[in-house]
Amino acid sequence: VQQRQRWFGVIALLFLIVIAYADRVNIAVMLVNPDFLQHFQLGGDRAHQGTLMTVFLLGYGLSAMLLTPFLETLMGYRRALTLSVVLWALLTAASPLAGSLMLLCVVRALLGVSEGPLFSLKTMYISDHFAADERGKPNAVSALGVSLGLVLGFPLVSFLMAHFGWAMSFHLLALLNLLLGLALVRLFVHPLAWSSSSRPTDPQPVLSRVWHTFALAWRTPMLGWILLIEIATLSYLWGSSSWLPAYLTDEKGFSIKQMGWMAALPFIVSIASKYLGGVLLDRIRPYQAPLIFVCGGAATALCIYGVMSSHQLGWIAFFLLAANACWGAQGAAIPTLLQHYARPEAVGSAYGLINGIGNLFSAFVPMAMGMVMASQGKVSSGFAVLIASQLLTLLAGGALFGRMLLARQMKRA
């Protein structure tokens, strides 16, 4: 029964990530809605359009990095997830009430703050409930929520926007977040009685305990190399999901309804590849895991180059699908490597560090892509930034493999 219950928690976290990502991509879909663009005076301004995702990611990154140690030390993942869901639902509902672009940016930044600890809290749950040689699959399954959220998010927001208008779509998403999100957390996400998330209250002062957790996270071995890979991975995610709708509508002539499903297709493929990546992780030794980044990064970069240089729709679709398959296969390796190295009482904060800093850096990718597009006059030209991100994955993965192999040989000697 306990075996089944811990997997219920993983599935609940998967769907929590699904609704969070559906909530995040609504801005990417809004950028092809003339009424939304006119309301916030964003028409034709690619750089300012990219800023809407950038401010969200800045709030998200700072929260993941700085707020997670407080939540891990003082609340545990169940109560922290409950608070997070309530806040992000309220902020989603408040988004259309913003009377100016500046106010919308503030709301988006606060939304990022409320969602920032989500992946760190998920990592804490899996570390509590699964042994070291079992974490590949639950990490992969829960991470499927990213792709599934994008798969469902693009057509869902497109449908809501087409039938209820852009403003009402925010309110309906907020209601979905609140009702479904709270039900998932309260019914299925439970800490173990002996876990680090439910340990007795420490008599030390609060700030001292939080600082101790934060310091342990910073001292995680191989943290720098894993961080570089996280930056590159998130750069690809946010860059591609932010601009794929505009690429399909503005450059390829799809309608908004067609765009919703076409934008989702590449992320459907990454669902299967993420799970396969998790299965592979449980069958190889930890020091071999970085090879997934080397092979996946090289293959993804080549596929994105294929998207940029192809003119036939069939080849463009093939390269988009292949790129996301190769990118998706890398997904579970990052938290699995971190769980291998981080101290159990600081694993959430360690993931918060790399996820937070990764999002802070990748926050500027949508804006950078918008600037490249503005200078070159084509949406696809901005995809060169995605190629650079995957080349960084390749190089950092190779360096991490070398370091881990050397550490293993020294330990055996």
Name each model feature, range by range.
Residues 1-2, 193-226:
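Juxtamembrane intracellular "pre-TM" segments in multi-pass secondary transporters
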Residues 62-99:
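Conserved MFS/SLC helix-loop-helix module at the cytosolic interface between two early adjacent transmembrane helices
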Residues 63-76, 275-286, 373:
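Helix-to-loop junctions at the C-terminal end of transmembrane segments
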Residues 28-29, 221-275, 331, 335:
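Extracytoplasmic gate region of multi-pass secondary transporters
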Residues 142-192:
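Helix-loop-helix hairpin linking two adjacent transmembrane segments in secondary transporters
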